[in-house]
């Protein structure tokens, strides 16, 4: 019995110490309350609506009054004649965004870190962050101005240089859609996504760079032997999170660039799970069908998250948990 008394006292002392720290940091702790409330209201409470996917939901009878239909809506989604095309578009667009959008913030963060003048660095940081705060409605308007056949900037420049004789229909040609969509996404998100890598780079000790410089390493070599290895943990974590969103190909950007889904020519390469759910499920008031498609997407994303996290833990001992 006596052998356990010191452990109990130690545990009690730790609890008191932790409680004391919590009370001292109560103002800091309270700052997370709004975020927790938002997550609770918009992420966890709506999970109760998952049962709609297994019912033939009717607005008049409500969730509890609607009859159970099992996997009927999942079967309808998988057997839809557009399912293969939708999955292809979703995966291709997501992979293109991952291939070009994932390394771009890392490269930008490294380049910004190489700017010695702090004032110039902050200026370029601000310039690169700004696109993130521009609405997709505005971005779509900018793309129309740039790529329109009727007086579009790109067509005007190409024709003035003699590269083309007639204006190209960029906005209604399926061959250009993926390029335009991915380019716009990379431009819009790169600066903001670079923040986490800039923060990680700022935590690297300057002594490492000084020691490398004394050993004759150039600035370019220092990037590969110091900067990138030191932020590899952050790189892997961000990659895991990106892989877990493999079926989130986009919604508002695609919807705006396809004229609210009315451009049938583009929909053959633009229709993804989210736009399909909006068009077939929400607009047609097939709420159970839309929920089933959303549940399918969420399950696949969770599986990808678990797989990516497990592979990362085995290969590099870096994981989310």
Language-model-derived ranges and their functions:
Residues 1-22:
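Short, Lys/Arg-rich, polar N-terminal cytosolic tail immediately upstream
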Residues 24-321:
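A structural signal for multi-pass alpha-helical bundles of membrane permease subunits
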């Amino acid at each position: 019995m006596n052998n356990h008394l010191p452990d109990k006292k130690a545990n009690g002392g730790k609890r008191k110490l932790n409680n004391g720290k919590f009370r001292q940091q109560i103002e800091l702790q309270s700052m997370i309350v709004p975020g927790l409330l938002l997550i609770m209201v918009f992420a966890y409470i709506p999970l109760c609506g998952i049962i709609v996917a297994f019912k033939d939901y009717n607005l008049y009878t409500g969730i509890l009054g609607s009859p159970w239909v099992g996997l009927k809506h999942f079967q309808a989604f998988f057997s839809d004649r557009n399912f293969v095309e939708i999955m292809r578009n979703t995966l291709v667009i997501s992979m293109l965004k991952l291939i070009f959008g994932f390394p771009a913030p890392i490269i930008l963060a490294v380049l910004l870190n190489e700017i010695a003048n702090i004032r110039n660095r902050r200026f370029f940081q601000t310039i690169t962050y700004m696109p993130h705060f521009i609405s997709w409605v505005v971005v779509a308007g900018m793309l129309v101005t740039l790529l329109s056949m009727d007086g579009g900037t790109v067509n005007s420049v190409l024709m003035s240089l003699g590269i083309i004789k007639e204006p190209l229909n960029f906005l209604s040609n399926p061959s250009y859609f993926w390029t335009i969509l991915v380019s716009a996404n990379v431009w819009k998100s790169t600066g903001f996504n670079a923040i986490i890598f800039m923060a990680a780079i700022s935590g690297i000790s300057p002594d490492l760079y000084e020691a490398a410089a004394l050993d004759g390493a150039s600035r370019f070599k220092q990037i590969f032997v110091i900067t990138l290895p030191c932020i590899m943990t952050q790189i892997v974590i961000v990659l895991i999170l990106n892989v877990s969103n493999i079926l989130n190909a986009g919604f508002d950007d695609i919807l705006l660039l396809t004229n609210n889904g009315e451009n049938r020519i583009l929909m053959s390469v633009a229709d993804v799970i989210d736009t399909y759910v909006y068009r077939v499920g929400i607009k047609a008031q097939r709420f159970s069908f839309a929920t089933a498609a959303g549940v399918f997407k969420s399950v696949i994303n969770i599986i990808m998250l678990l797989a990516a996290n497990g592979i990362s833990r085995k290969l590099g001992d870096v994981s989310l948990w």
